[in-house]
């Protein structure tokens, strides 16, 4: 087979590969630097290299996992993640199913109302008063779950995916006596595994990284999510209580080590889960974003 590609095509491929390599380096280097620095005995690196200065040490990780605040933050974040993502998937799939059915007369006005909320809101103070005073969710983990129960963007993506499923399947199920709940949970959702995986990723990462709502609504330390603990460690001297028994001259280095180690501990669960759902990611986004 004759290769009909010209010199311009090869130049284009070369620059594509070059740009991708540069983007990979820019993306991976900061993460690898933090990983290496977290194992460094001095909390520093040898110049711009990824070689830990002073050798390798696991002391920072031992101190991190001995800190009860971090373990409590992990537990709270996992509770928020599991309960929040489950609620997100349930409500988003039901909402997407409703507005994807052409026989539903109010689907267009309902979609316009939801899209309006994507661009306009009452502001931070009314939101705080609503959640804290009217709903009485102050200092309650539900304040971190219920307000974001449905993402309109995710609902639109899932709705488009549902619209791509052949209507004949629904019609056949109705002839057999199936109702809307049966059609959604036994036909539509089993055929939408890719988009469900994408929704789990989107909602899960959002819950894992969320911290601002916790600053607003959570007052007791035993209810802090992990990201609040991480924020305190990074911007304050809260590492001092974790370094009992560390010599004075080594405290600065150990403080830096603890900060790096805490970042890795807070990031690791998402990094561990992502490879297992990555194969669904591109497929799900393409199915949900392009109709036809």
Predicted region positions:
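A hydrophobic, multi-pass inner-membrane permease signature
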Residues: 1-292
């Amino acid at each position: 087979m004759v290769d009909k590609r010209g010199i311009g095509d090869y130049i284009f491929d070369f620059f594509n590969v070059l740009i991708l390599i540069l983007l990979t380096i820019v993306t991976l280097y900061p993460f690898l630097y933090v990983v290496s620095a977290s194992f460094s005995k001095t909390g520093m690196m040898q110049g711009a290299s990824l070689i830990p200065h002073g050798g390798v040490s696991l002391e920072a990780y031992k101190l991190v996992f001995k800190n009860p605040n971090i373990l409590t933050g992990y537990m709270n974040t996992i509770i928020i993640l599991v309960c929040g993502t489950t609620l997100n998937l349930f409500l988003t799939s039901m909402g997407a199913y409703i507005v994807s059915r052409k026989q539903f007369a109010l689907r267009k006005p309902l979609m316009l109302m939801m899209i309006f909320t994507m661009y306009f809101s009452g502001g931070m103070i009314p939101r705080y008063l609503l959640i804290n005073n009217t709903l009485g969710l102050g200092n309650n983990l539900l304040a971190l779950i219920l307000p974001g129960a449905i993402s309109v963007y995710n609902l639109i993506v899932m709705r488009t995916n549902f619209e791509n499923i052949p209507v004949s399947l629904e019609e056949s199920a109705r002839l057999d006596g199936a109702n809307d709940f049966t059609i959604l949970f036994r036909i539509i959702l089993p055929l939408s595994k890719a988009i469900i995986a994408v929704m789990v990723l989107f909602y899960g990462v959002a819950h894992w990284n969320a911290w601002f709502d916790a600053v607003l609504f959570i007052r007791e330390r035993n209810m802090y999510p992990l990201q609040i603990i991480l924020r305190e460690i990074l911007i304050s001297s809260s590492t001092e209580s974790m370094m009992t028994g560390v010599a004075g001259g080594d405290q600065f280095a150990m403080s830096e080590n603890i900060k790096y180690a805490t970042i890795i501990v807070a990031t690791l669960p998402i990094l561990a889960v992502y490879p297992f759902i990555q194969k669904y990611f591109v497929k799900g986004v393409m199915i949900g974003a392009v109709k036809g």
